[in-house]
Amino acid sequence: MPELFAYTDGACSGNPGPGGWGVLLQAKEGDRLVKERALKGGEAHTTNNRMELLAAINALESLSRASTITVVTDSNYVKNGITGWIHGWKRNGWKNAAKKPVANAELWQRLDEANARHDVTWKWVKGHAGHAENERADELARAGMAPFKP
């Protein structure tokens, strides 16, 4: 059975401003690439954090059945949010530690639902540090943003 990986990235020109998200999905058997699929999208007026979240959401929502997958992101916001902070937010009625509404709560809720359907391992990598798949995800995010740039 191949191992599944999703390499995700978001990009924004200005913050807020036009933005894009990209996903590189790969199925691997050992070091051998079995299948690959690229996803991208964007919005005219958004933030980098929203694009990072949408990349992860679209990666998981694109899977047609419950899967074991490793999601690789360069966003500490996404990784820390889904593996840690979200538990407190849910307990506190989607309020943060300062008792304020959680930013991007609707996207966090979507990610939480998508995450629950799969067996997900979340992994952080440093962005723009020569990680080939992360660089590809970044290129996809920039391509997703392109139609929305003036």
Curated annotation (Swiss-Prot):
Q: Which SUPFAM superfamilies match?
A: Ribonuclease H-like
What keywords would UniProt list here? Cytoplasm, Endonuclease, Hydrolase, Magnesium, Metal-binding, Nuclease
Q: Would the keyword Nuclease be found if you checked this record's keyword annotation?
A: yes
What Pfam family is a match, any one?
Answer: RNase_H
Please tell me where Mg(2+) 1 binds in this chain.
9, 52, 74
EC numbers for this chain: 3.1.26.4
Annotated GO biological process: DNA replication, removal of RNA primer
Which free-text remark accompanies the cofactor? Binds 1 Mg(2+) ion per subunit. May bind a second metal ion at a regulatory site, or after substrate binding.
Record's catalysed reaction(s): Endonucleolytic cleavage to 5'-phosphomonoester
Q: Name one GO cellular component term.
A: cytoplasm
Q: Where is the RNase H type-1 domain?
A: 1-146
Output the superkingdom of the source species: Bacteria
Q: Which cofactor does it need?
A: Mg(2+)
Q: List residues binding Mg(2+) 2.
A: 9, 138
Q: Which region is the signal sequence?
A: none
Q: Keyword Hydrolase on this protein?
A: yes
Q: Which GO terms describe its molecular function?
A: magnesium ion binding; nucleic acid binding; RNA-DNA hybrid ribonuclease activity
Q: Quaternary form?
A: Monomer.
Q: What does this protein do?
A: Endonuclease that specifically degrades the RNA of RNA-DNA hybrids.
Family, according to the entry, reads as follows: Belongs to the RNase H family.
User: Which PANTHER family does its entry note?
Assistant: RIBONUCLEASE H1
* Name recorded for this polypeptide: Ribonuclease H
This protein's species is Roseobacter denitrificans (strain ATCC 33942 / OCh 114) (Erythrobacter sp. (strain OCh 114))
